[in-house]
Amino acid sequence: MDSKYFATSRNDAVGPSPVKFSFKRKYDAMANSPILEKKPHVAQIKQTIAPILLTSKRTSIEQQQKSLPVFNCRHRILKELEANDTVLIMSETGSGKTTQIPQFLLLAGYAKNGMIGITQPRRVAAITVARRVAQELNGTIGDTVGYTVRFEDVTSRATKIRFLTDGVLLRESIKDRLLLKYSVIILDEAHERTVNADLLFGIVKDAQKERRKQKLANLKVVVTSATMDIDHFGNYFNCKGMYLEGRTYPVRVMHTKEEHEDYIHTVLVTLFHIHRTTPKNHDVLIFLTGQEEIESLAQQIRQLAKIDTTGTTDLRVFTLYAQLSQGKQLECFVPTPANVRKVILATNIAETSITIPGIRCVIDCGFVKEKSFNTVDGLDVLKSVRISKAQAWQRAGRAGRDADGTCYRAYTKAEMDSFADATQPEILRTNPTSMVLQLLALDIDCNNFDFLDPPLEDGLRSAYKSLDALGAIKTGDDSYITPLGRQMVQYPLDPKYSKLLLTASSFGCMEEILSLVSVLSSDHVFVSNSEKNEMAALAHAKFQSKHGDHLTLLNVFNGFLKSEKPKMWCHDNYLNLRSLTYARNVRRQLREISEHLHLALNSSDDIEMLKKCILNGFFENIAVLQRDGFYITASGNIRSKIHPSSVLHGKYKPSYILFTEIVQTEQTFLRQVTEISIEWIKEVVPFVKNIPTR
């Protein structure tokens, strides 16, 4: 690689990186220059790579299991768990903890009086690991081994090992605070520190205490990670930690020598350099920030592979992000033919829990998309931020799972030195509204809950205020959850969406709101195609509503539900089949919950009533047009514009709008907007004050 472009380092760094000269010139310069680098051992890299390995023709599953480092520690693990109710396990890359520890416990008889539950922060990890463990036990998924994620339950009465997302277990705890269906809870990937995981830490501690108090069978808890602060967790759980050796290979780390503005360009150049100079069995994993960025780059790579004259047709691109269907996510794990290189574009979903075989090269953009909560205005803002040093090492380590590898960082060493050491826990930076409602549903006051790290006071005050306005709680000396609030927690949704569904019947549009909430939960239904932009725009135009994006999305989803051949219909209309199929499944389950709550499933074509209903749930997301063409949000007075993807962008600007979320890039945008009126605000949500003047 051109020494003017990349430098070697044993440490990590962060930042974007394109250059001002042409793609070919940069590409050739990199392809014809030597790469000089040191090889730090990946044992230095603090990360989690769970052993999800594909069975090879030469190696049996049993041989693979015995080759994992955790296998030789199985007796030690069981001995520790027998002596203690809680065990902390810190294991290096590739130890086998995620797949093997549940099996050790099953064979030791821990599933005789309850299930072994293993939480994962992401649905794709829960599904993938469950399938692997079922395969290792020579069973069918849903029998001895199953999984439960939001809107999907693949378990049976025979299930002994159950993988589930932390959000699912948290919701179960509302109905069963003692978690009586479980004999063991394994809290995996503890370092991720999601809000749900942090809540579960306190809930399992409380369940253990109450079981002992009531002289019930002890609940065993195993907390596993590769990068957790063992002292912090040990003090919290009042137990010691055990460390397991991992299995890693050397990874050479490259940083750009200069800072660049466009890391996408850097990623492209680096990928085709790798493709030209390394064996085809060296698969590539590229870390990006989100679905739109991933799909856009995937198109560019495919186009460049077609037109390049250097034999780059032997390259296959896959994508991996949360919104993908299960089938599409699992495609990444299927080996490609011997002469075809696999390139996977992924979000941080690929940092931990799942390991994709064959990865020898990692390209790290150095950014991650995060939601942050502004306690002043009570709004979530979605923006790309720098990753932490711990994340950088986790990403680099993905190149050293099967053999020696290389990590190319699209940022300088100096940039990386400025990164935070570890990722800030979600509970300190995200909207705590759902968390507060969940705890109140458990009759737990946030001020009395045993947090590993307590949320910010300003955030809690904002959450209580928001829930009070939604009618979910009553605040005062002793805040408590209302009957409406208890109904709201029945839906696995943001409280705003739950409120929408619970009040839709009174507006006469329950069926429409079921569809709208479902499609909003799936996100990104429109497919962009740079080769056929005009055709895609024409196809999308027929769904557009002059009222805004929410009704446009409703038109799309209704068309999808009515189509006799959904796959062909989506192809012809440049729409995302995976997202719409997911939305259809979500709608089915939300409708079942609504029926269980005895809500009237009425329907209406009254556009005004539908928009008023949406306002009733999104009253915190109101913005008012100013004379300079910007919008000011009613909460927080944030200056913003309508997002370019909106049907209202570049057209008539309504005086008053509501929006789904704020997206922050170089500018601040309001995404998914609908026109409303000041009269509706006064009629539907008269308690909303401080509406900005025009």
From Swiss-Prot:
Inactivation phenotype: Conditional RNAi-mediated knock-down in germline cells results in hypotrophy of the nucleolus.
InterPro entries (UniProt xref): DEAD-box_helicase_OB_fold, DEAD/DEAH_box_helicase_dom, DNA/RNA_helicase_DEAH_CS, HA2_WH, Helicase-assoc_dom, Helicase_ATP-bd, Helicase_C-like, P-loop_NTPase
Ranges spanned by the short sequence motif DEAH box, renumbered to the chain: 188-191
Pfam families xref list: DEAD (PF00270), HA2_C (PF21010), HA2_N (PF04408), Helicase_C (PF00271), OB_NTP_bind (PF07717)
Presence of the UniProt keyword ATP-binding in the record: yes
Cellular location(s): Nucleus, Nucleolus
Gene Ontology CC annotations of this record: nucleolus
GO BP: positive regulation of transcription by RNA polymerase I; ribosome biogenesis
Catalytic activity: ATP + H2O = ADP + phosphate + H(+)
SMART domains registered for this protein in UniProt: DEXDc, HA2, HELICc
Positions of the Helicase ATP-binding domain: 78-246
Enzyme class: hydrolase
Presence of the UniProt keyword Ion transport in the record: no
Domain Helicase C-terminal: residue ranges: 270-443
EC number per UniProt: 3.6.4.13
Entry keyword set: ATP-binding, Helicase, Hydrolase, Nucleotide-binding, Nucleus, Ribosome biogenesis, RNA-binding
Gene Ontology molecular function: ATP binding; double-stranded RNA binding; helicase activity; hydrolase activity; RNA helicase activity; rRNA binding
Residues annotated for ATP binding in this entry: 91-98
Described function: Part of a translational control module, also containing pths/DDX47 and ais/DDX52, which coordinates germline stem cell differentiation with ribosome biogenesis during oogenesis. This module allows for coregulation of ribosomal proteins and non1/GTPBP4, a p53 repressor, preventing p53 stabilization, cell cycle arrest and loss of stem cell differentiation.
UniProt record similarity statement: Belongs to the DEAD box helicase family. DEAH subfamily.
Protein name per the record: ATP-dependent RNA helicase DHX33
Top-level taxonomy: Eukaryota, Metazoa, Ecdysozoa, Arthropoda, Hexapoda
